[in-house]
């Protein structure tokens, strides 16, 4: 972040930096970012080879920094949003959920692979290198899962997968929440449901535990 933060802020942009560890978070804050996207190892995409789950990483970072935090990695509904807020986040990022949305420009084959995935149907790749990756399980990614070779060259044909629908052409970056997504739905419907679930969860928790305050 040291290279670009000042330039971006001078151009009037708000800068949130994605961080996979406490050390990265502290470095980003020192560089003057406006906020952090704290992403646990559950998330899809480019990862820290030494991945840390959101339930550990998010409250750890929150305890050490004062900037706004967007939680990423494992968040897709009102319940997980409420959990993120309880752990110190101000917002959530739902990457895999939005990749699977009706308006997403990626090929239907990728969306359907997310919908049909179990919670164990992602693989962690490239751990011996940097960045590591979390992707949906296919024949290709299953072969690459324990490879010590750098797999970044596989993205040379990414458009054949992303927009052409050939799931074996490249690597489909996908988070573990794929196992909880059961349909391709419009974004507006997803957001409305997340909001409704969030307030239901908060209301239920308040009613269940408010009385304990006076014990």
Model feature map: region roles:
Residues 1-67, 78-79, 83-87:
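Alpha/beta enzyme core
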Residues 48-70, 76-212:
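Conserved active-site-proximal phosphate/metal-binding subdomains
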């Amino acid at each position: 972040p040291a290279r670009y933060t000042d330039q971006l802020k001078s151009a009037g942009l708000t800068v949130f930096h994605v961080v996979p560890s406490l050390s990265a978070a502290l470095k980003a804050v020192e560089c003057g970012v406006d906020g952090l996207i704290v992403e646990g190892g559950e998330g899809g995409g480019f990862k820290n080879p030494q991945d840390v789950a959101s339930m550990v990483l998010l409250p750890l970072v929150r305890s050490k920094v004062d900037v706004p935090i967007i939680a990423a990695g494992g968040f897709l509904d009102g319940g997980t949003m409420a959990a993120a807020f309880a752990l110190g986040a101000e917002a959530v990022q739902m990457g895999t959920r939005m990749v699977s949305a009706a308006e997403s420009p990626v090929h239907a084959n990728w969306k359907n692979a997310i919908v049909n995935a179990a919670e164990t149907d992602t693989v962690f790749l490239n751990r011996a290198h940097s960045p590591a990756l979390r992707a949906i399980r296919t024949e290709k990614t299953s072969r690459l899962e324990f490879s010590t070779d750098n797999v970044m060259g596989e993205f040379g044909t990414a458009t054949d997968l992303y927009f052409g629908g050939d799931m074996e052409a490249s690597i489909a970056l996908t988070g573990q929440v794929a196992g909880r997504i059961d349909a391709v739905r419009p974004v507006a419907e997803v957001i409305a449901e997340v909001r409704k679930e969030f307030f239901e969860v908060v209301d239920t928790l308040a009613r269940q535990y408010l009385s304990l305050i006076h014990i």
